[in-house]
Amino acid sequence: MKMMDANEIISFIQNSKKSTPVKVYIKGSLEGIDFGPSAKTFITGNTGVVFGEWQEIQAALEANKEKIDDYVIENDRRNSAIPLLDLKGVKARIEPGAIIRDQVEIGDNAVIMMGAVINIGAVVGEGTMIDMNAVLGGRATVGKNCHVGAGAVLAGVIEPPSAKPVIVEDDVVIGANAVILEGVTVGKGAVVAAGAIVVEDVPPYTVVAGVPARVIKQIDEKTRAKTEIKQELRQL
């Protein structure tokens, strides 16, 4: 898995064409109206839907207001620099309501649950589950066969660009509402208890808990049984 450099992300955002896309439901004498070069129109008779950039469509609405009886505008962003990831080719299970930005890498058979938010430059390894309402900040990297619990936060690092991102190695389980701060590495096979706030590196095959998180024991058979990763949930 690759990790996107912070300066690459900054350059990507800086140089991207900022976008304010809208969807307009419109009614009126619409024949011959030019809604702008970026617009896609789906018009039948005197009603239709127009997709495009607000600046262009706004100008068309104003210029043709005498022909237009009514319209409703849907808009969910303003001068957005980063589009959402095109999910159609991703070999993973991604549930409705997940928000995944472009330039995110998602491994095969990963699972992204409802309400999860994954920012630019993040990496999700093969077979890893990101549970409901979890947040992966910019450049956060999660290895293979992990579970990031509901409401957990892996802090993002884009600025300052020299800062080290969160790295979660393979086979890690992170409990609900845990927080992993910038620069922390969670070692292979470790378990982070629910609600823990992790401010320093976690050794492999240990269990950490508390605020701030501290090692409370080594992984044992009882812990493995309680934190087992079920491959059946990752089948496509």
Curated annotation (Swiss-Prot):
Disulfide-bonded cysteines: none
A biological process from GO: diaminopimelate biosynthetic process
Top-level taxonomic group: Bacteria
UniProt keywords, alphabetically: Acyltransferase, Amino-acid biosynthesis, Diaminopimelate biosynthesis, Lysine biosynthesis, Repeat, Transferase
Reactions catalysed, as given in the entry: (S)-2,3,4,5-tetrahydrodipicolinate + acetyl-CoA + H2O = L-2-acetamido-6-oxoheptanedioate + CoA
GO molecular function per UniProt: tetrahydrodipicolinate N-acetyltransferase activity
Pathway named in the protein's UniProt entry: Amino-acid biosynthesis; L-lysine biosynthesis via DAP pathway; LL-2,6-diaminopimelate from (S)-tetrahydrodipicolinate (acetylase route): step 1/3
Keyword Acyltransferase: yes
Chain coiled-coil ranges: none
Enzyme Commission number(s) of this protein: 2.3.1.89
Family of this protein: Belongs to the transferase hexapeptide repeat family. DapH subfamily.
The protein's role, per its UniProt record: Catalyzes the transfer of an acetyl group from acetyl-CoA to tetrahydrodipicolinate.
Protein name as it appears in the record: 2,3,4,5-tetrahydropyridine-2,6-dicarboxylate N-acetyltransferase
Source organism (scientific name): Geobacillus sp. (strain WCH70)
